[in-house]
Amino acid sequence: MQDNILGRRSLMSGLGAATAALALGSKTASAQTPARPFQPARHSQDAWLNAVPGTHRNFIDASTPNGAGEGMLYANNLYVANKSGYSLNESDVAVVVCLRHFATAFAFNDTIWAKYGKLMSTMLQFTDPKTKEAPSTNLLNSADYGMALPNLGNTIESVVKRGTQFAVCDMATHFFAAQIAMAAGG
């Protein structure tokens, strides 16, 4: 009798497993509906991004004085790397460097730096590495600093000549303008 019970249990377990296998295996696997490709929101303020030439698009975000310098270095590196790695021309590579937060001041020209360099130097905690004083020019426009700055001599002008475009933070620009106005008594 004991052998009969074990035999029936074994038979029932086997039939249960076989039934489950048939039920699961006989169903045709259906793939999920593919997700729609990502489509970013479009705003008229961003239309200029559609006009940026080049099929290999890169966006570099810089938010600090060091980051601004590194942005110039990285932009140059993208042109060099895409030329050597993919045989791409500079016109095939689209680079946008965004200067925001404390990197925004490096979007300002030498006239602004000459007049407000001391104030900006204090706000940014950034000094000329040669003089240890507040800069009176935009140091990212000079190739004379070499390894002393994170751009390693790659200037704003040199990456612009290669095709780099810049996005500059509106909020940070207004912040700097307000700080300069307050310091000037306005």
Q: Where are the regions a protein language model picked out?
A:
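A cross-taxonomic marker for long C-terminal extensions/tails that follow the last structured domain
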Residues: K130-G186
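Solvent-exposed loop/turn segments at secondary-structure junctions
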Residues: P65-G67, H101-F106, F166, M171-F176
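C-terminal segment of N-terminal export signals and the immediately downstream linker at the start
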Residues: G25-T55
